[in-house]
């Protein structure tokens, strides 16, 4: 891809936008960056662009800048419906995402992992397995470092593992992973997409450019995933914790069994540090992605056994008076809360926050069967109570700290208190990490 002397516009100056601008400038492009924030708000980002001849267009998006560019690179947080992007698209300007730009230069085999939930855990495990097997590996994408930073560093690698969001897939054209994984599908980001269907279609683009030489790792237990996997050009490689597979990877009686091209490997799950049924799926997906690209079973099993839960994903906080407390602040949608509820019994569930637009009714069965007490907080509390409040003992709390105190009073020894919000955090907190820290502090103060 020739960039020298091309007029390239980078839209959005978060971490990804800054990395793209630096890379493009290093390749001789005439780069302009645009962001609706002002210079004071962007001081840190702008300092990273100093001395590179990059033009700035702040507090506005000029239509002429968009339509007169040769190429536009869009940051993930920028919606497709931005009027200036629509105008540029109609004018025939090539518009791509950062992952599309990076993939045009990456030479190593690329593993791309998406899904509504579990992406970060599965991506991190996959990267760790490659490293344990001796491959020089870059792990990034929607977590950690943008893919484009690998190119800017010019560090030689043998494997690339990327967590990919639906936002990043919106502007791909030739993005083609050697292995693409779709972990699951459930309602999310309906504040961004016009419909659930539109969200699903964005996710499915991860397979769009694959051929029969590539692999599609898919969840055989997810009806939506399997429905949309029919007709994929890539070689289908399913994983399941519910059914035995002739070709794929599945769980049976304490073993993960891998079957591929007549070969079988067995991985005992005893001793795994990572707990929860959803994490069993993440582990199988990670093993599939890595074993399909030449990792060895012994080293891979050793890596999986040692892996511990990432922060804010069903993380154990403490045990007090016979009650175990867990923090799952990253569970910002219904699908992730379903997986958490499947992992415990006798639960006091703390949920709520900023409503993202989906229905909470898919939680009904698990709330009825497993949740003894439901404590609701935040903007979504009213609607959650309407949909779930008749299924179990339900209370409201004005603050997270009040919710923790109430949960401590309600939960009998042998029970579990789980904060798994099913909502984003922005009504009460800066982000999900601040929500987690406040919860942990309140629990430890009991």
UniProtKB/Swiss-Prot annotation:
It is an enzyme of class 6 (ligase). Transmembrane segments: none annotated. One of its GO terms (cellular component) is cytoplasm. InterPro entries: Mur-like_cat_sf, Mur_ligase_C, Mur_ligase_C_dom_sf, Mur_ligase_cen, MurD. Keywords: ATP-binding, Cell cycle, Cell division, Cell shape, Cell wall biogenesis/degradation, Cytoplasm, Ligase, Nucleotide-binding, Peptidoglycan synthesis. Pfam families: Mur_ligase_C (PF02875), Mur_ligase_M (PF08245), MurD-like_N (PF21799). GO terms for molecular function: ATP binding; UDP-N-acetylmuramoylalanine-D-glutamate ligase activity. Pathway: Cell wall biogenesis; peptidoglycan biosynthesis. It catalyses: UDP-N-acetyl-alpha-D-muramoyl-L-alanine + D-glutamate + ATP = UDP-N-acetyl-alpha-D-muramoyl-L-alanyl-D-glutamate + ADP + phosphate + H(+). ATP binds at residues 115-121. It is found in: Cytoplasm. One of its GO terms (biological process) is regulation of cell shape. Its EC number is 6.3.2.9. Cell wall formation. Catalyzes the addition of glutamate to the nucleotide precursor UDP-N-acetylmuramoyl-L-alanine (UMA). Belongs to the MurCDEF family. This is UDP-N-acetylmuramoylalanine--D-glutamate ligase. It comes from Pelobacter propionicus (strain DSM 2379 / NBRC 103807 / OttBd1).
């Amino acid at each position: 891809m020739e960039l020298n002397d091309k007029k390239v516009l980078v839209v959005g100056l978060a971490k990804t936008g800054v990395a793209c601008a630096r890379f493009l400038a290093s390749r001789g492009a005439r780069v302009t960056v645009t962001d609706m924030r002002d210079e004071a708000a962007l001081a840190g980002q702008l300092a990273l662009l100093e001395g590179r001849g990059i033009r700035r267009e702040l507090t506005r998006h000029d239509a002429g800048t968009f339509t007169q560019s040769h190429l536009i690179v869009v940051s993930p947080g920028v919606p497709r419906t931005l009027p200036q992007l629509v105008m540029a698209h109609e004018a025939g300007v090539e518009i791509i995402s950062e992952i599309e730009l990076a993939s045009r230069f990456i030479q190593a085999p690329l593993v791309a992992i998406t899904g509504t939930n579990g992406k970060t855990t599965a991506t991190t495990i996959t990267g760790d397995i490659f490293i344990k097997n001796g491959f020089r590996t870059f792990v990034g994408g929607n977590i950690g470092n943008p893919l484009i930073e690998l190119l800017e560093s010019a560090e030689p690698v043998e494997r690339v593992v990327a967590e990919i969001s639906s936002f990043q897939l919106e502007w791909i054209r030739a993005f083609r992973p050697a292995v693409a994984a779709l972990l699951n599908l459930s309602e999310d980001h309906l504040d961004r997409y016009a419909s659930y269907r539109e969200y699903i279609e964005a996710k499915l683009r991860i397979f769009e450019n694959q051929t029969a030489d590539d692999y599609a790792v898919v969840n055989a237990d997810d009806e939506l995933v399997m429905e949309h996997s029919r007709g994929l050009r890539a070689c289908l490689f399913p994983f399941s914790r519910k059914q035995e597979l002739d070709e794929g990877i599945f769980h049976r009686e304490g073993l993960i069994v891998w079957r591929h091209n007549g070969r079988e490997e067995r991985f005992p799950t005893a001793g795994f540090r990572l707990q929860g049924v959803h994490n069993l799926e993440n582990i199988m997906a990670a093993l599939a992605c890595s074993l399909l690209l030449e990792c060895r079973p012994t080293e891979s099993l050793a890596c999986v056994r040692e892996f511990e839960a990432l922060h804010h994903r069903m993380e154990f906080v403490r045990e007090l008076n016979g009650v175990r407390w867990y923090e799952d602040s990253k569970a910002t949608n219904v699908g992730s809360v379903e997986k958490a509820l499947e992992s415990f019994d006798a639960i006091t569930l703390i949920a709520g926050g900023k409503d993202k637009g989906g229905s909470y009714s898919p939680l009904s069965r698990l709330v009825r069967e497993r949740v003894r007490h439901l404590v609701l907080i935040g903007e979504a509390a009213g609607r959650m109570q309407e949909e779930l409040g008749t299924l179990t003992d339900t209370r409201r709390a004005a603050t997270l700290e009040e919710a923790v105190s109430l949960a401590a009073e309600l939960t009998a020894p042998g029970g579990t208190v789980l904060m798994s919000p099913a909502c984003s955090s922005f009504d009460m907190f800066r982000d999900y990490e601040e929500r987690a820290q406040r919860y942990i502090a309140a629990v430890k103060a009991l």
